Curated annotation (Swiss-Prot):
Known role: Translation initiation factor that is able to deliver tRNA to the P-site of the eukaryotic ribosome in a GTP-independent manner. The binding of Met-tRNA(I) occurs after the AUG codon finds its position in the P-site of 40S ribosomes, the situation that takes place during initiation complex formation on some specific RNAs. Its activity in tRNA binding with 40S subunits does not require the presence of the aminoacyl moiety. Possesses the unique ability to deliver non-Met (elongator) tRNAs into the P-site of the 40S subunit.
Phosphoserine modification, residue list: 237, 254, 361
Protein name as annotated: Eukaryotic translation initiation factor 2D
Subcellular location: Cytoplasm
Record PTM N-acetylmethionine, positions in chain: 1
Biased segments, Polar residues type: 247-257
Annotated SMART domains: PUA
Gene Ontology cellular component terms for the protein in this record: cytoplasm; cytosol; nuclear body
Any single GO BP term: intracellular protein transport
Length: 584
């Protein structure tokens, strides 16, 4: 379901009543969880968000996010745990085991075929058709996928372990997993006999090189089953088989690498130094600490990683900046009550001068179907002029008719050629043009018809352009040009009051510039650390607006001007940004 990128509709903090309902739903859906475990999974006071999204096939899914990780998702009123949750509660669902080579196929969207199952010494778990199950890999009990059983255990055995076993909904490494902290499965020892007993166990499980080759051809449902998995029949046991590289790869991060907190501390330091060295200038000071985080540090986060201060040892931005101030890299002051700003930076500090800027990579700005996301490039916007009926006589000699679209330079050339061809240039003063009946009808007002006989070149051209209808052409990268009458509407940024006197930022007309409102909302939600929603724009057909909690005009302006490189003339409302020292 999440093999391809999804589209976020909204991301909001959960209400108290919804939190209580979610707890009740979790208790009903997963009766094996105790009261303490339910409270741990759905905390009472910690931040919990509801993300509504559309999967790539159009399914409406509700995802519950806690601590930056998706913990549960709801589809057609059924509640499912994510792999992040299953790693904390590995026995929550009946678990079936498969080979590490199969994982790549599952991540790509394949269902799990029964030949891919590994038969444990104790036999397969007992399930009925439609039961929710977990899927783990040989050597590690941490689930890497969840799916719905396509048949009961008895039917699986009767079929000789052939056919489709599980409809896979979610996997480790899919796009739902990527929306979290992207941690690897923990190493959880299998509930099995020790290696000595396994070697004596009749029918012990193993996989030879031929079988590994077959597994690489495992197919989707409906295709020929080239990748059937059988238990090997040689004398060697699993304990004697060489360690599978796929299994090693899955567990290596959690055992050998640094802890997630240490990794986040390093990422925080990297983004901090990168922002000071490349983005912040002396003229930007004093700089709100919230702006420094949202507009500068987040922009320096490497592609594929997510900066989350709550997962660092500092927990809060203010605590981290205090540490940087103690190291005399920056100076932070409270210029107004409750609002801190960076007022000074020591750009000669050894940590800044010695910092090596990471290899730049284009920031993925659009969320598209498929695993490859494309960077945003601003469109080429060109003003045009449309020939109205009243100007047809002037332009028909050059082959143009009513409704023709022309550039300003083309209009100039046509008017000059018309004047020269009809010998209208004044003989005594080359800067003047005599007006013939066609020019009089096209560019003069009625009260000027008998009084104005000549016009300077610049006045003639200006009047001509004013009489033409405005139009424009938008060319998005890789697409055919789009030509429309009228003037292109600017991206409109406004502030509005909502319930409880809360202020929100609303932005409209993003689509005209090739921007996906859902993508922009997702980026702003991360940058501003505020809830965002996408709704139909009032009074505009087939147009959406993005709403962000609080005054986020500064963050929005930085995104549009600095990162998307859109011209300022196409954006209105930037003056509504918070001034340094003012409260939100």
């Amino acid at each position: 379901m999440f093999a391809k990128a999804f589209r976020v509709k909204s991301n909001t903090a959960i209400k108290g009543s919804d939190r209580r309902k979610l707890r009740a739903d979790v208790t009903t859906a997963f009766p094996t969880l105790g009261t303490d475990q339910v409270s741990e999974l759905v905390p009472g006071k910690e931040e919990l968000n509801i993300v509504k999204l559309y999967a790539h096939k159009g399914d409406a899914v509700t995802v519950y996010v806690s601590g930056g990780n998706p913990i549960l998702f709801e589809l057609e009123k059924n509640l499912y745990p994510t792999v992040y949750t299953l790693w904390s509660y590995p026995d929550l669902l009946p678990t079936f085991t498969t080979w590490p080579l199969v994982l790549e196929k599952l991540v790509g969207g394949a269902d799990l075929m029964l030949p891919g199952l590994v038969m444990p010494p104790a036999g397969l778990p007992q399930v009925q058709k439609g039961d929710l199950c977990a899927i783990s890999l040989v050597g590690n009990r941490a689930p890497v996928a969840i799916g719905v059983a396509a048949m009961s255990t008895a039917e699986m055995l009767t079929s000789g372990l052939k056919g489709r076993g599980f409809s896979v909904l979610h996997t480790y490494q899919d796009h739902l997993w990527r929306s979290g902290n992207k941690s690897s499965p923990p190493s959880i020892a299998p509930l099995a006999l020790d290696s000595a007993d396994l070697s004596e166990e009749k029918g012990s499980v193993q996989m030879d090189s031929t079988l590994q080759g077959d597994m690489r051809h495992m197919t989707l449902e409906g295709e020929e089953e080239n990748g059937e998995v059988h238990q090997a029949r040689e004398d060697k046991s699993l304990s004697e088989a060489p360690e599978d590289t796929s299994t090693r790869g899955l567990n290596q991060d959690s055992t050998d690498s640094k802890t997630l907190q240490e990794q986040m501390d390093e990422l925080l330091q990297q983004c901090f130094l990168h922002a000071l060295k490349c983005r912040v200038k002396k003229a930007d000071l004093p700089l709100l600490t919230s702006t420094f985080l949202g507009s500068h540090m987040f922009s320096c986060c490497p592609e594929g990683r997510q900066l989350d201060i709550k997962k660092s040892s500092y927990k809060k931005l203010s605590k981290f900046l205090q540490q940087m101030q103690q190291e005399q890299i920056i100076q932070v002051k409270e210029l107004s009550k409750g609002v801190e700003s960076i007022v000074a930076v020591d750009w000669k500090h050894p940590r800044i001068t010695s910092f090596v800027i990471p290899e730049p990579s284009p920031t993925s700005q659009t969320i598209q179907e498929g695993s490859r996301e494309q960077p945003y490039h601003p469109p080429d916007i060109k003003p045009l002029y449309c020939v109205p009926a009243s100007m047809t006589l002037l332009f028909q000699e050059s082959g143009h008719k009513k409704g023709s679209f022309l550039e300003g330079s083309e209009v100039r050339t046509i008017v000059i050629n018309y004047a020269k061809k009809n010998d209208l240039v004044d003989a005594d003063n080359k800067n003047l043009v005599r007006l013939d009946p066609i020019l009089c009808d096209c560019i003069l007002e009625k009260n000027e018809q008998h009084t104005v006989m000549k016009l300077p070149w610049d006045s003639l051209l200006t009047r001509c352009l004013e009489k033409l209808q405005p139009a424009y052409q938008v060319t998005l990268p890789g697409q055919e040009p789009i030509v429309k009458k009228g003037r292109i509407c600017p991206i409109d940024i406004t502030l509005a009051q909502r319930a409880s006197n809360k202020k929100v930022t609303v932005v409209r007309n993003l689509e005209a510039y090739g921007l996906d409102p859902y993508s922009v909302a997702a980026i702003l939600q991360q940058r501003c650390q505020a809830s965002t929603t996408v709704n139909p724009a009032p009074g505009a057909k087939d147009s959406l607006q993005v709403q962000i909690q609080g005054n986020q005009v500064h963050h929005l302006g930085w995104l549009l001007l600095e990162e998307y490189q859109l011209p300022r003339k196409h954006i209105q409302g930037l003056e509504k940004a918070l001034k340094p020292g003012k409260k939100k």
